[in-house]
């Protein structure tokens, strides 16, 4: 009889978690600009966030060992990038300059809603299209950095966080 009560309690807790877990209404889990800093692993597995949108201001959801924590990103913010031109397929051009985004539509054309591949001149960084897939924590596999930026990955692979706080070339979500 006590085992049944324990099962009911566990089922109730799972149901409660499912009911109170926020679901994205838009389906967009946009990643914030910048790169996660190299964080010291946290011995207790803390799940402060799962996506960048869970963090306040410009903070990003970063891996620290088996933990996910909100941290101030490294690298230039979008406002610090200037003179970067990005071509959105054949439907329009976006220019980022002095922190402002300008989109020009060609006559009769529509601007693509997919994120463009951005080249940050002078930094040698090329961000590829798509988003990094979500990672179940902890994830088994190589716990070492295989890349720092998308341009170090072959084909359309992106440099994404793996489950142990390191970066690996991964097939993106579109």
UniProtKB/Swiss-Prot annotation:
What Pfam families does the entry give?
WAP (PF00095)
Chain positions covered by the region annotation Disordered: 68-117
Q: Signal peptide location in the record?
A: 1-25
Recorded GO cellular component terms are:
extracellular region
**Compartments in which it is found:** Secreted
Q: Which cysteines are joined by disulfide bonds?
A: 36-62, 45-66, 49-61, 55-70, 132-160, 143-164, 147-159, 153-169
PROSITE patterns in alphabetical order? WAP
Q: What is its main location?
A: secreted
The record's section on PANTHER family has: WAP FOUR-DISULFIDE CORE DOMAIN PROTEIN 2, WHEY ACDIC PROTEIN WAP
Spell out the protein name for this chain. WAP four-disulfide core domain protein 2
Organism of this sequence: Mus musculus (Mouse)
